[in-house]
Amino acid sequence: MTGNIVSRRYAKALFSVGQKQGEEDLAAYGLALTELSQILEDSPEALRLFQNPVFSADEKKAVLEKLLEKTSAGPVVKNFCSLLADKGRLPVIPEIASDYAGMLDNVQGVVRGKLVTAIKLTVKRQKEIKTRLEEQLKSKLELDFAMDKDILGGVVLQVGDKVLDASIRAQLQMMKEQIKRGV
């Protein structure tokens, strides 16, 4: 099985446990997984250890327990991670966390997006843009803002799986293609 299928299956299993426990636990499990995933992202040597077949499941569990102490993980998430260690699935924790977060967003009606501009936007302007987009989408929006001078001007908006590229760079690229085709 590929990591994607595996991670979705484990995320779905933990998610169903969280749904039975209630919305508070559902969010807490997601937070703990996100924290653990961030620790692994910041510590690639721990992730390499989890991938290394030379180390036993018990050795990996010992390292995992130390990492879990740095998170808000409760007993359910700790047991879940122990199961992952037993099954040799610790390397897919970041993907499981991502899949779990997507499921949680879906249940809570949250859409994630990213807005890239050529200049830094003020906090007031960011709030205005976010509010207008939420009104248009008719759902709660978690919007990340980024700056990229390479787009020259305009905006690149990604919401969910849709991308709107209204940057000057994209417009210049389209003009270039039209000139090449002789239009």
Swiss-Prot record:
Record-stated family: Belongs to the ATPase delta chain family.
Domain of life: Bacteria
Keywords: ATP synthesis, Cell inner membrane, Cell membrane, CF(1), Hydrogen ion transport, Ion transport, Membrane, Transport
InterPro entries recorded: ATP_synth_OSCP/delta_N_sf (IPR026015), ATPase_OSCP/d_CS (IPR020781), ATPase_OSCP/dsu (IPR000711)
PROSITE patterns: ATPASE_DELTA
Membrane topology per record: Peripheral membrane protein
Places the protein is found: Cell inner membrane
NCBIfam families documented for this protein: ATP_synt_delta, PRK05758.2-2
Subunit structure: F-type ATPases have 2 components, F(1) - the catalytic core - and F(0) - the membrane proton channel. F(1) has five subunits: alpha(3), beta(3), gamma(1), delta(1), epsilon(1). F(0) has three main subunits: a(1), b(2) and c(10-14). The alpha and beta chains form an alternating ring which encloses part of the gamma chain. F(1) is attached to F(0) by a central stalk formed by the gamma and epsilon chains, while a peripheral stalk is formed by the delta and b chains.
Protein name: ATP synthase subunit delta
A GO cellular component entry from the record: proton-transporting ATP synthase complex
Gene assigned in the entry: atpH
One term of GO molecular function: proton-transporting ATP synthase activity, rotational mechanism
Protein's UniProt keywords contain Nucleotide-binding: no
Function: F(1)F(0) ATP synthase produces ATP from ADP in the presence of a proton or sodium gradient. F-type ATPases consist of two structural domains, F(1) containing the extramembraneous catalytic core and F(0) containing the membrane proton channel, linked together by a central stalk and a peripheral stalk. During catalysis, ATP synthesis in the catalytic domain of F(1) is coupled via a rotary mechanism of the central stalk subunits to proton translocation.
Primary location class: membrane
